[in-house]
Amino acid sequence: MQPDVATLTLPFTDSLITIGTTMHGGAIASLIDTAAMVAAWSDDSVPADLRGTTVSLTVIYLATAEHEDIQATARVLRRGRNLVYLDVEVQSLSGKSVARGLVTYKLG
C-alpha cells in the first residue's frame, strides 16, 4: 500500500446478488466506503489511536457488476486538518467501469 491510495477487491458471491447475477449496489457502496477509509488512514502522519467516520458518500453507478469480482481504488484528493476528501473508482477485474464514489472522511 502506498500513502494516499488504497485498492481493495470484493469477490463476487451469491450472497451479494440483488437480481439475477447482478451485484447489489449496497455492496458496491460499502466497498467504496471501506476503500476510502483505508486510503484516509494510509498517511504516515495519522496516529494509530485516532478514530474516524464517513461524513459524506456519493456513489455514481455506471454499469452493473454481473457475476464478477470488482476492485475499488481510492485516492486522496485533499487532506485538511480533520477531513480527507477522496475519489474512488470501481472496476470489474476485466476493466469495465462499474461505479465512482466521492467520499469525505473525518479523522479524529
Where do the PLM segments sit?
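Residues that recognize and position ribonucleotide moieties
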Residues: 21, 30, 50, 96
